[in-house]
Amino acid sequence: MPTIQQLVRSERRKIHKKTKSPALQSCPQRRGVCTRVYTTTPKKPNSALRKVARVRLTSGFEVTAYIPGVGHNIQEHSVVLIRGGRIKDLPGVRYHVVRGTLDAAGVKDRRKSRSKYGTKKPKS
């Protein structure tokens, strides 16, 4: 426990929490342009071809973002919206593409959890 005199001399250190998505810079989402769209393989126990995109953000960062859902229309120079949220089995992928906004179309024929994939309500 410091004395009052020690606290007068130098105040207490603030604890700075390290952000998990620095490229967003405290914004909920960021817009960016895809520089490369490709597939990559996950870490050890899992096996798949995960769809990811390299995105140059308006904040100046270049990040790797996961493209969720079955099928996508994203290609190079597509303008996409990025949100936070990592993919546990893809190292270095800390962002998600928001489906159904800007150039990223919603998932076709999606019935459940539609709001997460930018799909409109089907006609009965």
Swiss-Prot record:
Q: Where in the cell is it found?
A: Plastid, Chloroplast
| Taxonomy, superkingdom | Eukaryota
Q: Where is this region: Disordered?
A: 1-28, 104-124
| Pfam families the record matches | Ribosom_S12_S23
Question: What keywords were assigned to this record?
Answer: Chloroplast, Plastid, Ribonucleoprotein, Ribosomal protein, RNA-binding, rRNA-binding
Q: Which residues belong to the signal peptide in this entry?
A: none
Compositional bias of kind Basic residues: 11-20, 109-124
Is Translocase included in the keywords of this UniProt record?
A: no
InterPro entries in the cross-refs: NA-bd_OB-fold, Ribosomal_uS12, Ribosomal_uS12_bac
Q: Supply one GO CC term from the record.
A: small ribosomal subunit
Q: Name one GO molecular function term.
A: rRNA binding
Complex and partners: Part of the 30S ribosomal subunit.
Family to which this protein belongs? Belongs to the universal ribosomal protein uS12 family.
Kindly give the PANTHER family that the UniProt entry links to this protein: 30S RIBOSOMAL PROTEIN S12 FAMILY MEMBER
Q: What is this protein called?
A: Small ribosomal subunit protein uS12c
Q: Which gene encodes it?
A: rps12
